A protein has these predicted regions:
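Acidic, surface-exposed loops and disordered segments
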Residues: 1-250
Length: 250
């Protein structure tokens, strides 16, 4: 239900930004403010050729190879979750590079079923936060229900240690503070079709690539664990909210 609108700029053939088409054949169009990026199959030109040559020792001196490896290790060491965001949007070019890095991650059996949905619309970002908080509020009501509590303590006793965190998130949200997305101006959701056997693993490999690229670009980022947890608790609720076919993993 999506069609390519334009390729990623600067000749980067890693995927296409997609937008929704009008309603047709009973299919729901995806919201227009979502950038949908789907991976392409083999046959892409390789922008990482120089780095690969360095890693293989071709066309490079030992000194430059050592420098490359040192820089790579320094990047891995410097990667941090950083929730201190400004209100400025992330440059589109930086977002494109982050998505390309994610796309370059390996997938099980080279199936390449991983897809990416980039959300930059402020209202939709607020809806993601609201969905997450409401999901946790529902969990709290169940855990604290006096009729269910004896059974739940046996079945999911470990969940009760998270109650203080849930109450804090809900309370802060009620006072106008977002501890879910922390005021982020963009969220990249990584998902695969339902039934993808290694969808979770593939998606999290893609996340790590994206995380390292964001670090190298000086873009503050963190893993949205609360959002992923809420998505897992609520069936396909978040996917339906965002018009995503499949399951969000990262």
């Amino acid at each position: 239900d999506l069609y390519p609108v334009r390729p990623v700029r600067a000749g980067v053939p890693v995927g296409h930004f997609h937008a929704s088409r009008p309603e047709a054949a009973g299919r729901r169009a995806a919201p227009e403010h979502l950038h949908r990026l789907r991976t392409l199959r083999r046959g892409l030109s390789d922008r990482l050729g120089p780095a690969r040559r360095l890693s293989r020792g071709k066309s490079a001196s030992r000194g430059s190879r050592r420098a490359f490896l040192a820089q790579m290790l320094a990047l891995c060491r410097s990667r941090r979750s950083n929730r201190a965001f400004t209100s400025s949007p992330v440059p589109e070019r930086a977002l494109e590079m982050i998505v390309e890095a994610a796309h370059r991650a390996p997938t099980a059996s080279n199936l390449q079923q991983v897809a990416f949905t980039l959300v930059t619309d402020p209202d939709t970002l607020r809806r993601i936060t609201a969905f997450t908080v409401e999901t946790f509020a529902s969990v709290v009501r169940k855990l604290e229900n006096p009729l269910l509590k004896p059974l739940l303590k046996v079945l999911v006793g470990g969940a009760y240690k998270y109650l203080p965190n849930f109450h804090r998130l809900i309370g802060e949200y009620g006072e106008g503070r977002d501890l879910i997305l922390r005021g982020a101006t963009a969220v990249l959701l990584i998902h695969t079709p339902d039934g993808s056997r290694f969808g979770c693993q593939d998606s999290n490999l893609a996340y790590q690539n994206a995380s390292l690229m964001a670090e190298s670009l000086g873009v503050s980022q963190f893993y949205t664990g609360f959002v992923c947890s809420a998505a897992g608790q609520a069936g396909h609720g978040l996917e339906k909210l965002l018009g995503i076919d499949g399951k969000i993993h990262a």
